[in-house]
């Protein structure tokens, strides 16, 4: 399709189908070389006479190219293997001393050790893989000069030996791919193959004018002899093909051996130029083209990453490379022209998006893998090197892998592994020709490979995903039996449980800890009855879920508990009417969710443990708020009798008074007064103080502990309005109040205002109610903030904690109040509203009187007196 101009699939032309009108010409540097495998064992056995003969055969300005290898200056030997190079020098050039210096030409770095040079490269040339070491002799000293190769745009490396070769290189490398021009239509096959397999099991002798020598290297680069000098720039050349003889083997890249891959970025828009004919266009025909940029590794690397840089990237390149932006733009345009890269703006954006977000094209793609023989030398290096030539879309990865049948590719890319040539074929091979293979197996026929052990372990172990495996019934039974014997198991018991249940020590200890917590809450939140043996029941296996909900009593508003402490509050799907009816019935029966009840509800409602647990928790919260309000209303009445008919089933239960019956256990005003007074003295009573309060108030110790816990939470959140008044009053006069208050309990609730007995604080209040103008107002939260503002005019962060404690407001509320004052000051309006402040003071006093639960000597507000008078009638 014409619009898909960025198609990177080369047109494969069979040797037998070559157009007679096209002349077969082998050009000097017409593109990146075909990577040909060579057997290393043969490399070691080839004599020096054969090397000399090969050197003579390549006299016609042949330019040897090695990918990141070593080149011998005394002969034409080249190899990427340092040990192989050392072996060659020792055997062929015994007079050369290898224990010499290493020099990094780029940085002027000199060292005697190769390890130091490697460390230097890691530090100052990170990510650079294009090194070449050249051995030279200076002043009777052998020096290895490390340089960075000139990188052509197809991933191969070129070392220009002399000016003549450099000239021919410039001419030949400036050709434009015929596959991008209408000329290609003359040679194009009917079908563009998406997968290309290169094999070497059989080779053909080709005309002598295209003869190439196979060097005994680990990875040898085969190239064509240089073309004649009379070759014009418009001549076309066709690369020899390698004929396949065996079906390709397709392997899957799923299996990866970590740490064995050396990954370099490859631009798939580039193709092996030996597989693509070119139209030779001189680069110097482009105006203002700066040829010096061709050797700039920064620009070459940038182009290889993406051929269409953005303006910001061009600006950065201009600053780093010390060239003008215009020169860099022209250089990129020339490279795209040379390599036939012509994309529409939409294709550029699509390719950029897919490259940088890790997306790989869905077009079936193939990597041709050419493995070499296993080296028999004891050089300690990886035994197998595979060179992967990628043919596909932008953003893929070219890898050089050590190992067999493995490739660290994360995308589903099919690998076609060519056959390994025999030793005789390697010796005889001249220039094999490649042609497209129709027998290439599709990617779907890939051989399945096992996943890595580490990945399987991660999948098997649920803890790696934060999911705790649910315990079986047998494990829970053993744990519960042990728990009933001892709630704090010894190490020997834990070891025994570990052997029996198969659980870890941490899981067992956490189960015991959570179960103790749940049972303690269950005990403290239930009313104590003689026939109630639920205190010996293990409530819930808290380890069955990642998060567990405490079994909170209905009257204890455990508002600080979040059933999902590590996550944001979860929103579950709406429950049906039938599910709600089942949940409501279970909650009315018992607000404590046992393990058996939870399993029954799961089976009946089809809800998850979390959904059921969260519903019960929210239900307890809402019910606790209602009961707290009811308790305040009832305590204001000062009534000593229990009004069981006005409360709903499952109300908060404490220890019942001596004369009370049923399950309604409510604290009297005297008991509440004692608890509040003690709370003002200390929020964390000692065990002796708990026992003393239980003896004086008649309440159960568990109820007192539970009340202190809830009150501490309410105080922390600023919900205790009575705390300030109790704190301001004389605590010593409040302590011995209980006996005095009990004397006057028979008085009518709505009696007239009289002077109280034995209650200095109460008398002050009652007198103040009567006096009117001489009323002493306790400062509310806003009043405290107002006094502070009038004194300081702004909020000092150092005083914020003190203001929050005194005003019982939140941190944000205090900050917002001061911000509002600041805004009013800037607008020039009145800072405070006096009427609103007065009403707030009075309302707070009334609310405080409702919550203090004082005795009948207290004169309630009018709306409470109306309520009490109706109840008396």
From Swiss-Prot:
Q: Which CDD domains match?
A: homeodomain
Query: What molecular functions are annotated in GO for this chain?
Result: DNA binding; DNA-binding transcription factor activity, RNA polymerase II-specific; protein heterodimerization activity; zinc ion binding
Q: Which residues carry this modification: Phosphoserine?
A: 45, 47-48, 202, 648, 774
Region: Disordered; residue ranges are 1-63, 202-236, 626-667, 732-769, 829-873
Q: Where is this cross-link: Glycyl lysine isopeptide (Lys-Gly) (interchain with G-Cter in SUMO2)?
A: 159, 441, 454, 485, 629
Keywords linked to the UniProt accession: DNA-binding, Homeobox, Isopeptide bond, Metal-binding, Nucleus, Phosphoprotein, Repeat, Repressor, Transcription, Transcription regulation, Ubl conjugation, Zinc, Zinc-finger
> Basic and acidic residues bias located where?
212-221
Signal sequence region:
none
Residues covered by region (Required for interaction with NFYA): 272-564
- Region of interest: Required for repressor activity: 831-873
Per the record, which residues fall in region Required for nuclear localization? Answer: 734-768
- Top-level lineage group: Eukaryota
* SMART domains for the chain: HOX, ZnF_C2H2
- Composition bias type Basic residues, residue spans: 740-764, 863-873
Q: Residue ranges of region Required for dimerization?
A: 272-432
Q: Is this entry keyworded Zinc?
A: yes
Q: Where are the zinc fingers (C2H2-type)?
A: 70-93, 102-125
Where are the Phosphothreonine residues found in this chain? Answer: 36
**Which is one Gene Ontology cellular component term of this protein?**
nucleoplasm
Which portions of the chain have biased composition (kind: Acidic residues)? 18-30, 831-857
Comp. bias (Low complexity): 223-236
DNA-binding region, residue intervals: 284-346, 464-526, 569-630, 660-722, 777-832
Q: Which InterPro entries match?
A: HD, Homeodomain-like_sf, Homez_homeobox_dom, ZHX_Znf_C2H2, Znf_C2H2_sf, Znf_C2H2_type
Describe the task this protein carries out.
Acts as a transcriptional repressor.
**Subunit structure, per the record?**
Forms homodimers. Also forms heterodimers with ZHX3 which is a prerequisite for repressor activity and with ZHX2. Interacts with NFYA. Interacts with ATF7IP.
This chain's protein is named: Zinc fingers and homeoboxes protein 1
**What species was this sequence derived from?**
Gorilla gorilla gorilla
